[in-house]
């Protein structure tokens, strides 16, 4: 743009020619219409006192004034804090550069100070006297004395009051108008007075404009720029061209005055005319001025929003909430209605009634907090909505809406269009470029054009104008060059050219500290470099830099290193450490391993002077530097939240739920609710921690540096409840993963957020949070519920511990163990001592449970604990103890099971199948099912001589038994060497305790621990064979047992209340035990239970029915086990126990002898009722009458009965003689068939007996029942297709048939009748 033009109209001899001393970088096109007023503080700086006054004055930057003809004018005021005097010389060239007003503000406490303030004000008037129209002085004096104000408070204030100007007087040479206020005065009328001051400036300006407009064209003088005075010396000013030059320049000057006086339309016309006139004579400098004036006047109408409140000068560290310089690109395309307003036929704007007698004063929201800041900070005019009212004797000051919004008609036809403004600015700049003394004006024009193009959304034009500024050759100081770069930076930022803005900002920073500078300003350099972060896609928060990962790493690293150097030169070691930490945190992945190592060492050296901490740093100018953390140094590979040890983990106390109503099921899935719940509990840990209990988090770390990395004071980072974290110190080897356990104690209850950990490495304290760790699938945090404190206990037992703990489930809760060895049937006890180790919590809840590797039923027989005794000792106070006694009984199966071979060898009618035996099977000590086997039938054993002699011995009188050795297979039984129950058995069990107390008990939490029991059971005694024999009385029977001593010691066996026997080690003996027979009531109850269960099975369509014989056999087995207890004692020791007959298997003949017969016998011999053991005597040849009466005392009828009578002689040596045809004769049948014997029915049979020889005879009277032969089984009638009919048929069969129809039974009259026959 800047063409090389050879012709220079501005040349001259030596000497410094007048020029603008410096550009006004804050100028905009709209400032052409403003009245320039100097606002200056005088006297000592009292920022807190005068700040309010400065704000009030600066608010009045726009007024509405009615001119002499009644038309409203919009007058704008521009307050500046400083104005070079030589700029007034350019007032003819551009009138807005002329200072027209002066306002000073000062504070005094005495007359001397007031005089000094007046003197300073007058000196300013003299300095700018050539252009100054009006001036005002605002003085703040001391407050009234307290004693003087008491009267005013107590009474009404005086009409006039004591005025400050009455106490203090201004010097006589002070001619300016002064306003006096007390220090605490609210200055309510100050804005109104400043409005009057602005109005006065307007009228003076208006008079000058009118004077200029009335000048005759032939009498006007030539207006000159300061450097042009020598160019026109000796020229003929009456020439045609010079006359046109004079008229054109005056016309341009009048246009400037009209623009300031609010006559924008007139100014446009004048600028156009002046431009044509001056262009015709080749007056390039002033042609450029008219073109710039046209642009300014058009911009006032097109872009009134440029007068609105400008952006506050915010502190660079205070970013807007929720925004980030890396996330939001500065607004490049701002909305503008400029082009719309040109083409629109009617403008739609917010109109304000101009007849309202109010004055709109606009506020300037400045960030200045002191008078001194006003001296160093440029002032900008802006709009506000604070209205005040004022009156004037010469004009009416009305409400002043923002001009351009009050548009009653279309825009003027001669206004420049939007695209023409930038073209006219180009022309103006080209014209200015022809004059080297106009370089400052050229620079300002380029800046104004840039701001207009920003409003027009023309970033390329903005960049072109700004680039042209760099080529303008200006003689300026380094400070001015820095200022120029800063302004260019700001404009580039407004159009979104962040990198260009950052380049110039960094260039300005380097200018402050360039080589050769006598006073390098590192503070300003640091500030500017910090401000250039945005352009390089950096921000002060390292987390956002890492998250966005934008920009150019090489440039970013270089910038941060330069910033570190500046911080070091400032002597701010903490700041240098912070930036070096920032560099390592954000650029770690962009560095080579060598650079990483070098930077780490450099950080270590910097932190040696001042260690880094994870807290924000606040600089002197208010900039906040966020904390930087070495999140990946060391590198966290994994982090796991550990549960408490198993015996300390909290568990819920199970409470039986009350029935709250019917259970409702729906297949509908509420997906949104499910997703919300999953998202909510995504980071929730499944277990809980306990208040005041040490908790653990395991971290796996890796050192990425090539040297050892010491890490000290490593702690957990938490949020939520109070958590006391314990420090950890370690040294990490290079590139070696290392596990670290971090511990801490929650002090309160509630939710605990585990956010990460803190480290102290390389001299920097860092908070390493999980959410900031990149490249790992860590959640933002872990949420752990902390429940109330639980008591802790220690457990000891009175038994020795085992070498190894239990292998059962939940073995991790075992805290101690106990081992015990018992013989089968032996009892013992174990005392468990529980100590409450809590310092404050009582043990209020204690419950136990036992788990073992045996079935529950057997377990309950082995282990017993008195629960009521435990409850009686609760609660246990802190440091108190409670003793729990565990009774242990070595439960075992003492009845020897029969091998499978004997199951098939038994041919008795009462043989059982495997299915029937399962109904009363027992469990062995090893935990596996052991089905008791049925022994051989007694009928077979009776044929053996040994058994025969044994029975005879029992029936003959008290037995004389001797110990006998049992061999495998001998005696019809099974030898001890083949018994599986003779081997040692091992039982593992756990006694588990759940305990709680305090608030945790109320919340429903407890702990669980266990004691492991290792119980070894040794074989003691075993029942190898058994039989049932009739006793001397009908109400009893003899249970004959073969008992083996499986121990290695002699054993004393107590098998009745009064009878004992000694058994040698590994020997056996046979003992008879009298037992009461099972009552008929129990048999009847068993029959009823069997019928009910079979009926239930039929209703449930079960085909397998129960057999009454099985139920009766089981009943008899249980009857024997309940009544027979064999006590044993190992001689010479205190080891003793009890052997039970649980699981004994009985054949059908044994069952008939065990249970009470369903027949009631009444036998008479010679009309005398036979009683047991009664002696019956008769003579040889005498006919004796034998009467037998049977009664069915069962609840079922009996069928197919056969009553038989046999006489025999017992030789008492095991031999019985039934061949007595020559010795006894029976008159009548000795076998009588009874087809049916109903319940409670009686049958009687009578016969006569004649004995032919004397002797002792016995009569065997028995009744047998034979199984009923049926073509079709009753069960076959019960079909699934017809359950109702099957039920009725089944019931009829069950209740109509007797239980003897399925088995053969033999019921004898016990004992046999003994008859002694004597000679006559």
Swiss-Prot record:
Q: GO CC: one term?
A: Golgi apparatus
Q: Does the keyword Hydrolase apply?
A: no
User: Which parts of the sequence carry Phosphoserine?
Assistant: 317, 672
Give the phenotype of cells or organisms lacking this gene.
Answer: Failure of both actomyosin ring constriction and furrow ingression in male meiotic cells.
Q: Coiled-coil ranges per the record?
A: none
Listed GO biological process terms: actomyosin contractile ring contraction; Golgi vesicle transport; intra-Golgi vesicle-mediated transport; male meiosis cytokinesis; meiosis I cytokinesis; meiosis II cytokinesis; meiotic spindle organization; spermatocyte division
- Give the superkingdom in one word: Eukaryota
Q: What is its main location?
A: cytoplasm
Q: Where is the composition biased (Basic and acidic residues)?
A: 329-340
Q: Which InterPro entries match?
A: TRAPP_II_complex_Trs120
Q: Where is the composition biased (Low complexity)?
A: 362-400
Region (Disordered) residue ranges read: 313-411, 923-954
Q: List compositional bias (Polar residues) regions by residue number.
A: 314-327, 345-361, 945-954
Pfam families under this entry? TRAPPC9-Trs120 (PF08626)
- Which keywords describe this protein according to UniProt? Cytoplasm, Golgi apparatus, Phosphoprotein
Oligomeric form and interacting partners: May be part of the multisubunit TRAPP (transport protein particle) complex.
Family affiliation? Belongs to the NIBP family.
- Primary role: Cooperates with Rab11 and fwd/PI4K to mediate the flow of membrane through the Golgi, which is required to support cleavage furrow ingression, therefore promoting cytokinesis in male meiotic cells.
Q: What PANTHER family does the database record attribute to this sequence?
A: TRAFFICKING PROTEIN PARTICLE COMPLEX SUBUNIT 9 (PTHR21512:SF5)
Spell out the protein name for this chain.
Protein brunelleschi
Q: Which gene encodes it?
A: brun
């Amino acid at each position: 743009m800047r063409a090389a033009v050879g012709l220079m109209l501005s040349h001259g001899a030596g000497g410094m020619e007048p020029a603008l001393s410096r550009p006004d970088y804050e100028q905009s096109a709209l400032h052409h219409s403003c009245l320039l007023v100097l606002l200056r503080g005088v006297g000592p700086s009292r920022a807190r006192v005068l700040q309010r006054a400065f704000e009030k004055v600066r608010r009045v930057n726009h007024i509405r004034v009615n001119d002499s003809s009644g038309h409203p004018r919009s007058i704008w005021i521009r307050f500046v804090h400083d104005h070079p005097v030589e700029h007034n010389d350019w007032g003819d060239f551009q009138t807005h550069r002329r200072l027209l007003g002066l306002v000073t503000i000062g504070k005094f406490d005495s007359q001397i100070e007031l005089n000094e303030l007046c003197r300073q004000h007058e000196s300013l008037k003299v300095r700018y006297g050539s252009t100054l129209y009006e001036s005002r002085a605002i003085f703040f004096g001391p407050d009234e004395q307290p004693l003087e104000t008491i009267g005013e408070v107590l009474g009404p204030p005086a009409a006039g009051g004591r005025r400050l100007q009455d106490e203090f007087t201004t010097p006589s040479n002070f001619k300016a108008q002064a306003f006096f206020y007390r220090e605490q005065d609210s200055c309510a009328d100050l804005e109104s007075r400043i409005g009057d001051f602005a109005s006065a400036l307007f009228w003076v300006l208006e008079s000058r404009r009118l004077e200029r407009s009335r000048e005759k064209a032939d009498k006007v003088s030539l207006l000159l720029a300061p450097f042009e005075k020598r160019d026109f010396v000796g020229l003929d000013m009456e020439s045609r061209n010079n006359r046109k030059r004079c008229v054109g320049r005056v016309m341009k000057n009048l246009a400037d005055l009209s623009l300031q006086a609010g006559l924008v339309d007139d100014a446009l016309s004048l600028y156009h005319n002046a431009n044509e006139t001056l262009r015709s004579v080749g007056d390039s400098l002033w042609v450029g001025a008219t073109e710039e004036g046209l642009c300014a006047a058009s911009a006032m109408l097109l872009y009134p929003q440029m007068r609105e409140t400008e952006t506050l000068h915010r502190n660079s560290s205070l970013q807007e909430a929720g925004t980030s310089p890396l996330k939001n690109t500065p607004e490049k395309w701002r909305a503008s209605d400029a082009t719309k307003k040109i083409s629109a036929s009617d403008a739609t704007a917010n109109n304000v009634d101009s007849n309202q007698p109010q004055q709109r004063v606009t506020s300037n929201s400045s960030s200045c907090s002191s008078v001194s800041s006003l001296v160093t900070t440029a002032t900008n005019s802006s709009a506000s909505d604070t209205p005040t009212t004022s009156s004037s004797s010469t004009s009416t000051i009305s409400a002043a809406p923002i001009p351009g919004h009050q548009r009653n008609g279309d825009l003027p036809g001669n206004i420049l269009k939007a695209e023409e403004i930038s073209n006219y600015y180009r022309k103006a700049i080209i014209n200015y470029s022809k004059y080297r003394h106009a370089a400052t004006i050229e620079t300002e024009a380029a800046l104004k054009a840039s701001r207009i193009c920003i409003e027009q959304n023309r970033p390329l034009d903005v960049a072109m104008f700004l680039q042209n500024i760099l080529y303008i050759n200006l003689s300026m100081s380094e400070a001015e060059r820095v200022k120029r770069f800063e302004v260019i930076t700001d404009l580039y930022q407004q159009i979104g050219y962040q990198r260009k803005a950052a380049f110039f900002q960094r260039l300005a920073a380097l200018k402050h500290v360039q080589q050769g500078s006598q006073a390098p300003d590192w503070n300003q350099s640091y500030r500017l470099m910090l401000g250039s972060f945005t352009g390089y896609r950096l921000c002060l928060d390292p987390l956002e830099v890492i998250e966005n990962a934008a920009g150019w790493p090489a440039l970013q690293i270089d910038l941060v290193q330069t910033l570190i150097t500046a911080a070091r030169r400032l002597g701010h070691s903490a700041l240098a450490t912070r930036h070096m930490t920032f560099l390592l945190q954000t650029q770690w992945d962009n560095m080579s391993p060598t650079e990483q190592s070098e930077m780490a060492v450099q950080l270590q050296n910097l932190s040696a002077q001042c260690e880094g901490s994870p807290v924000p740093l606040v600089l002197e100018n208010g900039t906040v530097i966020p904390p930087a953390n070495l999140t990946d140094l060391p590198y966290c590979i994994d982090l796991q939240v550990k549960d408490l040890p198993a015996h300390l983990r909290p568990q819920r106390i199970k409470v039986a739920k009350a029935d709250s109503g019917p259970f409702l099921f729906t297949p509908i899935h509420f997906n949104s609710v499910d997703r919300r719940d999953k998202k909510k509990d995504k980071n929730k840990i499944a277990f809980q921690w306990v208040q005041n209990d040490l908790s653990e988090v395991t971290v796996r770390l890796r050192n990425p540096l090539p040297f050892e990395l010491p890490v000290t004071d490593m702690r957990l980072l938490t949020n939520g409840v109070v958590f006391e974290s314990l420090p950890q110190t370690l040294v990490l080897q290079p590139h070696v993963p290392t596990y670290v356990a971090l511990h801490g104690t929650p002090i309160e209850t509630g939710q605990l957020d585990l956010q990460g950990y803190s480290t102290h490495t390389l001299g920097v304290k860092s908070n390493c949070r999980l959410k900031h760790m990149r490249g790992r699938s860590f959640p933002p945090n872990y949420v752990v519920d902390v429940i109330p404190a639980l008591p802790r206990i220690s457990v000891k037992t009175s038994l020795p511990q085992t070498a190894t703990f239990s292998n059962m489930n939940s073995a991790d809760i075992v805290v101690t163990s106990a081992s015990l060895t018992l013989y089968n049937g032996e009892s013992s006890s174990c005392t468990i001592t529980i100590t409450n180790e809590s310092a404050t919590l009582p043990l209020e809840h204690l419950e136990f449970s036992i788990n073992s590797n045996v079935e529950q039923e057997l377990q309950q027989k082995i282990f017993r604990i008195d629960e009521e005794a435990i409850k009686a000792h609760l609660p246990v106070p802190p440091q108190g103890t409670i003793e729990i006694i565990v009774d242990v009984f070595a439960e075992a199966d003492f009845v020897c099971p029969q091998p499978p071979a004997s199951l098939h060898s038994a041919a008795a009618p009462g043989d059982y199948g495997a299915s029937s035996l399962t109904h009363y099977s027992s469990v062995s000590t090893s935990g596996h099912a052991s089905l008791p086997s049925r022994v051989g039938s007694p009928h077979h054993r009776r044929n053996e001589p040994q058994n025969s002699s044994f029975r005879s011995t029992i029936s003959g009188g008290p037995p004389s038994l001797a110990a006998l050795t049992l061999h495998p297979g001998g005696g019809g039984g099974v030898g001890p060497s083949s018994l599986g129950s003779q081997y040692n058995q091992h039982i593992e069990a756990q006694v588990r305790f759940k305990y709680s107390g305090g608030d945790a008990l109320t919340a429903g939490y407890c702990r669980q621990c266990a004691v492991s029991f290792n119980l070894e059971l040794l074989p003691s005694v075993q029942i190898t064979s058994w039989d049932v024999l009739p006793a001397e009385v009908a109400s009893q029977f003899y249970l004959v047992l073969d008992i083996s001593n499986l121990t290695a010691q002699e054993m004393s066996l107590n098998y009745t209340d009064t009878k004992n026997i000694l058994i040698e080690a590994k020997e056996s003996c046979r003992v008879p035990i009298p037992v009461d027979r099972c009552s008929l009531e129990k048999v009847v109850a068993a029959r009823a239970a069997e019928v009910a269960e079979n009926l239930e099975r039929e209703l449930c369509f079960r085909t397998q029915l129960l057999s009454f014989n099985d139920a009766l056999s089981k009943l008899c087995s249980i009857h024997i086990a309940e009544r027979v207890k064999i006590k044993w004692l190992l001689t010479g020791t205190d080891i003793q126990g009890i052997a039970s007959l649980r699981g004994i298997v009985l054949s059908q003949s044994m069952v008939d002898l065990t249970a009470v017969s369903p027949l009631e016998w009444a036998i008479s011999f010679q009309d005398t009722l036979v009683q047991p053991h009664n002696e019956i005597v008769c003579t040889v040849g005498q006919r004796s009458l034998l009467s037998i009466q049977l009664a069915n005392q069962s609840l079922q009828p009996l069928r197919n009965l056969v009553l038989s009578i046999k006489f025999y002689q017992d030789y008492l040596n095991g031999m019985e003689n039934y061949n007595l045809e020559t010795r006894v004769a029976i008159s009548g049948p000795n076998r009588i068939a009874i087809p049916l014997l109903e319940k409670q029915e009686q049958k009687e049979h009578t016969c006569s007996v004649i004995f032919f020889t004397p002797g002792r005879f016995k009569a065997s009277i028995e009744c047998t029942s034979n199984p009923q032969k049926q073509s079709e089984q009753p069960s076959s009638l019960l079909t699934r297709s017809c359950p109702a009919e099957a039920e009725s048929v089944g019931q009829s069969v069950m209740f109509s048939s007797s239980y003897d129809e399925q088995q053969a039974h033999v019921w004898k009259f016990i004992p046999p009748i003994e008859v002694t026959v004597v000679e006559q």
